[in-house]
């Protein structure tokens, strides 16, 4: 676990899965979500990461601390969400964006150290010539926000990481579309995914679906902390339902979560304890105090 700057831009898992491009692209990174611990982004409550390698476009703005001049931050300190760092941290990728940062620093000497004032297209052309990034990056703009048609298609699909990322990245426009998808109720898997996305966006329309995931008296198979080589889910389905119910402010879940919590002991998986703790922390209900 490391500390990152807050930059002019922050790269997130949603950007990676959606293939988001930037007008100030300086490199492309590639890896998978080998997270070294547990994930925290809401996307991974809906769909845990898999082992597929992905490309991530790196923005110069992610190297620039917001509100500061004369500073560039590279490597694992750049402005990115904790869960996206596995895709950005490979040695060759860090060397590439650090090379770009060095060129930007030299160019900034002509502007009293102001990196934001440099000739960005000239820097990008040099990076293409050095094969740090492909020529297509010269024509990048910010691909967000996406058109309404893309969100409508994503709300019907709900099967790909890209669809989930697009919907979570555009909450105001996604919520009515997800409510429509949930209301159709034609497919149980898609309905569950819609309910989880809604909850991740703070909407309790599908709370009953999540509550149903907690009906079993016994806990499901949880997850114990793993550092290196951690792929996939770091929470069980029940754990994820508990956290999502907190995110959508469903206090109806309190009794059920407390009943589940009463069955926990030191032999149960770490993820169950974490999920209950997150639920209790969210509501701050004195009724949960004995669990401490």
PLM features: what roles do these ranges have?
Residues 83-87, 188-191, 216-221:
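Short beta-alpha connecting loops at secondary-structure transitions
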Residues 159-172, 180-184, 189-203, 223-250, ...:
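Structural detector for internal amphipathic alpha-helices that build alpha-solenoid repeat scaffolds
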Residues 66, 267-268:
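Short, solvent-exposed loop/turn segments at the edges of secondary structure
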Residues 141-155, 171-185, 203-227, 250-263, ...:
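Amphipathic alpha-helical scaffolding segments comprising HEAT/armadillo-like alpha-solenoid repeats
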Residues 1-133, 137-153, 203-204, 285:
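Flavin (FAD/FMN)-binding glycine-rich loop and adjacent Rossmann-like elements that form
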């Amino acid at each position: 676990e490391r500390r990152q700057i807050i930059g002019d831009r922050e790269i997130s898992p949603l950007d990676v899965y959606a293939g988001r491009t930037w007008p100030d692209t300086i490199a492309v990174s590639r890896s998978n979500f080998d997270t070294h611990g547990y994930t925290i982004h809401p996307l991974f409550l809906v769909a845990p990461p898999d082992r597929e390698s992905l490309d991530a476009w790196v923005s110069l703005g992610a190297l620039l601390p917001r509100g500061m001049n004369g500073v560039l931050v590279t490597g694992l300190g750049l402005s990115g969400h904790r869960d996206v760092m596995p895709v950005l941290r490979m040695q060759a990728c860090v060397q590439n964006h650090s090379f770009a940062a060095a060129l930007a620093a030299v160019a900034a000497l002509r502007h009293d150290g102001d990196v934001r004032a440099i000739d960005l297209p000239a820097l990008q052309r040099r990076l293409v010539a050095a094969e740090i990034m492909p020529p297509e990056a010269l024509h990048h703009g910010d691909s967000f926000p996406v058109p309404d048609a893309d969100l409508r298609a994503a709300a019907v699909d709900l099967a790909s990481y890209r669809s989930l990322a697009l919907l979570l990245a555009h909450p105001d426009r996604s919520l009515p579309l997800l409510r429509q998808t949930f209301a159709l109720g034609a497919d149980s898997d898609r309905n569950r995914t819609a309910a989880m996305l809604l909850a991740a966006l703070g909407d309790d329309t599908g709370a009953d679906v999540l509550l149903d995931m907690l009906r079993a008296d016994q806990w499901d198979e949880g997850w114990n902390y793993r550092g290196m080589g951690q792929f996939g889910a770091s929470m069980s389905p029940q754990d994820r339902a508990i956290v999502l119910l907190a995110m959508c402010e469903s206090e109806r879940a309190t009794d059920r979560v407390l009943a589940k919590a009463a069955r926990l002991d030191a032999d149960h998986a770490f993820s169950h304890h974490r999920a209950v703790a997150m639920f209790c922390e969210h509501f701050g209900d004195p009724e949960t105090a004995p669990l401490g």
